[in-house]
């Protein structure tokens, strides 16, 4: 490891006392510390260095901080290298970042934005006069002191302009704030300090609208749009809310041609920044941020249909009255099942939260430095070589910065006009070959991180048993449920490790702690009608509201909010609390844009690339969104304006080797007979949709009811009374039984480890995947059964046959050791 210049080798612990962790910078964690020499507070970034690490970026940050002394740039105190840990010590800004502040207060007022722009421009003017570029201006990198000063921070990706290198040629920054010439650097040949002016203009919009333009798009799609010659600079959405001075200031700062874009010095002379702007504007903002009751309500919540009158808690009838066992419940304990089979196209396990708590929530002592070192070793916080793509994994900067990436892979492009819109019915398109079959999106941008998760068997909930053949059975978890349930999933809390059943119903979203079945209580989580649920990385997706948008809910946050509400009784109804005091961008439930009127959706993972997609079928279009790990959310990747042949019909994503995007199966058919081929009707998303694809009418003989991709080359196709097992071309498989036959009309099929479980209105039957022999069977003419969920765990509902309006019983297939 090369030696760093201007770095002391003395022990930094002799001067600085660490107090608490406050965030993460570009390459390391940041701590609040006390300077024992001056008794003042300081910010200390600690980075673990390993042999062979590229330290050029760290050296750049130290050099820029040391050389740039200005009131609007965080002051540099010193750097220390001790035991392979680099300490960069800077001025502490107690007000936090502007991103943190607007999350608490909502949008800034125009004069507050003007004040921030003026102070930031002063810092940029000084930086540019020294021949340096910041390259990562955004709300998260503008810090405030408690006195209302604005400081430029985080110079981890900054660059220096020299006489020999008049323009930077590296692709660096944060996508949504990136200037067009930076997005197209490989084609246009470079950029200069004016990219910071563009980023400040985007930041001004961010402060007024709580997010930068194009934020609903996947970052790579946003970059692709910005690099096009037809790209138009963004504007404020609400023209009437803001003054003409603000609009004109943004027009200048966001001038597309950098040769015509004004400098920071020139913009300091604009009327928007020369108006009377006292420091009190920012101190008032800080006061507001410290008082959450001054937050603004979320207008999105007004669109949700709520059930205020339905109880917050529902007790199982087993506690408060006799619970008679039905014939099927007796059979449930006699018939054993194999574990549910994990589909290769299911998203990976939820990554458990890293065991790294915010220091300061606990009593601090002399062992803090030891805990810092242990945590650094546990996290393996290292700097990769410059040739590697830097993964966006900072938990505190929710607008991830690209560090250094000489090559990001090809951007998604629009399909050429001459490309065929669909494949002939019957086969999935062949995988591409040749040099043009490179990945659409780099996996570092989009994939969920594969971490070594503890086994789900260690969770607190329904007890697992060893992995034995046929060791599971259905267990009743709730008796007499009054909810009109549409969907259900299971989820494990990342902190308590308790397992929960989450149900989506007409009356809202409720949870049941499977670790506390002696309580037998369903608790309301969200008071909005819900027709579909899916859980990804502790984010609960739901189809909710009067006009059925897709919503994303932060499950750990909602559970914590409910816990606090139960501790401190409020007069405000629990479902209205977020509308009263939590700003829109800080809400625990957020609406995914452009999904109004969604009829159905599916989640699928490409096992070849690791990318996870969300398909949303709307009445007149189909949306394809991709999971973006740094933001823990789905972002729009493509919008197909052509309507599906039947938006409410079959919608099953299929993943093919060599294809980045999933194929959408909208129908399947096949003549009777175990050796017959199944014909798939697929829409290849790379090419777009075709409006006149031939789909067999629903209900006719030979049309499939359900299609399930079990692994990379195996598909289950469910017909009225049989299940075919075929490969991706629709041909019967050679190793498994080509057809499983049933003597009842199939409603739902679920694939177990060695059998297929088919459900019908009065029971279920399992048949071996190898021999077609019956492996399990339960029949109860007195009950009507319905599968509520089959992702990870099978959740079943039953109601009396003679009284369909009666309360239902809920069951979960348990006793197996989950394969997830």
UniProtKB/Swiss-Prot annotation:
Subunit structure: Interacts with TRAF2, TRAF6, MAP3K1/MEKK1 and MAP3K11/MLK3. Interacts with RAB8A.
Primary location class: cytoplasm
Gene Ontology terms: cellular component: basolateral plasma membrane; cytoplasm; Golgi membrane
UniProt cross-references to PROSITE patterns, sorted A to Z: CNH, PROTEIN_KINASE_ATP, PROTEIN_KINASE_DOM
PTM text: Polyubiquitinated through 'Lys-48'-polyubiquitin chains, allowing proteasomal turnover. Ubiquitination requires the kinase activity of MAP4K2/GCK.
Organism: Homo sapiens (Human)
Residues modified to Phosphoserine: 328, 394
Alphabetically ordered keywords of this record: ATP-binding, Cell membrane, Cytoplasm, Golgi apparatus, Immunity, Innate immunity, Kinase, Membrane, Nucleotide-binding, Phosphoprotein, Serine/threonine-protein kinase, Stress response, Transferase, Ubl conjugation
Domain Protein kinase intervals: 16-273
Sequence ranges assigned to domain CNH in this UniProt record: 482-793
Binding-site residues, ATP: 22-30, 45
Catalytic activity, reaction form: L-seryl-[protein] + ATP = O-phospho-L-seryl-[protein] + ADP + H(+); L-threonyl-[protein] + ATP = O-phospho-L-threonyl-[protein] + ADP + H(+)
Region (Disordered) location: 387-442
Subcellular location: Cytoplasm; Basolateral cell membrane; Golgi apparatus membrane
Name used for this protein in its record: Mitogen-activated protein kinase kinase kinase kinase 2
């Amino acid at each position: 490891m090369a030696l760093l210049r201007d770095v002391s080798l003395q022990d930094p612990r002799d001067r600085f006392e660490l107090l608490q962790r406050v965030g993460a910078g570009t390459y390391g964690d940041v701590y609040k510390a006390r300077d024992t020499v001056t008794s003042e507070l300081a910010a200390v970034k600690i980075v673990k260095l390993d042999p062979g690490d590229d330290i050029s970026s760290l050296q750049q940050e130290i050099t820029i901080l040391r050389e740039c002394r200005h009131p609007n740039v965080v002051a540099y105190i010193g750097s220390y290298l001790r035991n392979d840990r680099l300490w960069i010590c800077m001025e502490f800004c107690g007000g936090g970042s502007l991103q943190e502040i607007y999350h608490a207060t909502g949008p800034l007022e125009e004069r507050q934005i003007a004040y921030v722009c003026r102070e930031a421009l002063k810092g940029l003017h000084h930086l540019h006069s020294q021949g340096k570029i910041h390259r990562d201006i955004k709300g998260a990198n503008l810090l405030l002191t408690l006195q209302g000063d604005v400081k430029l921070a985080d110079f981890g990706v900054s660059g220096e302009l020299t006489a020999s290198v008049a323009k930077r040629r590296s692709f660096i920054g944060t996508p949504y704030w990136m200037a067009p010439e930076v997005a197209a650097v490989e084609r246009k040949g470079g950029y200069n300090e004016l990219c910071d002016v563009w980023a400040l203009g985007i930041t001004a919009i961010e402060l007024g609208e709580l997010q930068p333009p194009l934020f609903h798009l996947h970052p790579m799609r946003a970059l692709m749009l910005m690099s096009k010659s037809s790209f138009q600079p963004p504007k404020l959405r609400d023209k009437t809310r803001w003054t003409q001075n603000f609009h004109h200031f943004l027009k200048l700062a966001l001038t597309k041609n950098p040769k015509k874009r004004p400098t920071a010095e020139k913009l300091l002379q604009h009327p928007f920044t020369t108006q009377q702007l006292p420091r009190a504007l920012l101190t008032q903002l800080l006061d507001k941020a410290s008082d959450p009751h001054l937050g603004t309500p979320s207008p999105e919540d007004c669109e949700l249909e709520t059930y205020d009158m339905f109880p917050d808690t529902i007790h199982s009838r087993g506690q408060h009255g006799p619970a008679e066992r039905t014939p099927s419940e007796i059979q449930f304990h006699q018939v054993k099942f194999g574990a549910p089979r994990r589909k290769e196209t299911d998203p990976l396990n939820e990554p458990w939260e890293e065991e790294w708590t915010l220091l300061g929530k606990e009593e601090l002592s002399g062992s803090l430095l030891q805990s810092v070192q242990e945590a650094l070793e546990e996290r393996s916080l290292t700097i990769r070589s410059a040739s590697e793509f830097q993964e966006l994994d900072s938990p505190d900067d929710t607008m991830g910065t690209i560090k250094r990436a000489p090559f990001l892979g090809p951007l998604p492009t629009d399909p050429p006009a001459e490309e065929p819109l669909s494949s002939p019915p019957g086969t999935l398109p062949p995988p591409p070959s040749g040099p043009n079959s490179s990945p659409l999106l780099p996996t570092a941008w989009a994939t969920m991180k594969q971490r070594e998760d503890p086994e789900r068997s260690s969770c607190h909930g329904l007890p697992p048993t060893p992995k034995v053949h046929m060791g599971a059975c259905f267990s009743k978890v709730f008796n007499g449920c009054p909810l009109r349930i549409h969907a259900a999933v299971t989820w494990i809390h990342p902190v308590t490790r308790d397992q929960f059943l989450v149900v989506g119903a007409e009356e809202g979203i409720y949870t049941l702690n499977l670790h506390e079945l002696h309580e037998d209580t369903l608790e309301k989580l969200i008071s909005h009608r819900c027709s579909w649920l899916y859980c990804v990385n502790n984010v609960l997706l739901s189809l909710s509201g009067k006009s059925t948008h897709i919503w994303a809910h932060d499950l750990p946050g909602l559970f914590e909010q409910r816990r606090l509400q139960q501790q401190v009784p409020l007069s405000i109804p629990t479902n209205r609390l977020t509308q009263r005091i939590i700003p829109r961008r800080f809400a625990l439930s957020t609406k995914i844009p452009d999904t109004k009127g969604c009829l159905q959706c599916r989640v699928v993972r490409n096992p070849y690339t690791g990318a996870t997609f969300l398909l949303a079928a709307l009445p007149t279009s189909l949306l394809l969104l991709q999971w973006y790990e740094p933001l823990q959310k789905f972002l729009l990747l493509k919008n197909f304006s052509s309507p599906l042949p039947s938006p409410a019909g079959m919608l099953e994503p299929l993943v093919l080797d060599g294809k980045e995007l999933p194929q959408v199966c909208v129908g399947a058919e096949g003549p009777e007979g175990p050796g017959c081929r199944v014909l798939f009707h697929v829409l290849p998303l790379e090419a777009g949709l075709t409006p006149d694809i031939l789909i067999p009418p629903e209900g006719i003989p030979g049309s499939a009811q359900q299609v399930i991709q079990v692994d990379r080359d195996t598909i289950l196709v469910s017909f009225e009374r049989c299940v075919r097992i075929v490969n991706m071309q629709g041909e019967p498989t050679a190793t498994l039984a080509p057809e499983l036959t049933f003597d009842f009309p199939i409603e739902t099929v679920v694939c177990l480890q060695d059998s297929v479980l088919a459900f019908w209105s009065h029971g279920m039957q399992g048949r071996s995947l190898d021999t077609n022999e019956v492996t399990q069977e339960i029949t109860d003419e007195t009950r009507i059964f319905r599968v509520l969920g089959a992702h990870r765990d099978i959740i079943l509902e039953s109601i009396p046959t003679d009284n369909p309006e009666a309360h239902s019983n809920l069951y979960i297939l348990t006793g197996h050791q989950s394969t997830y």
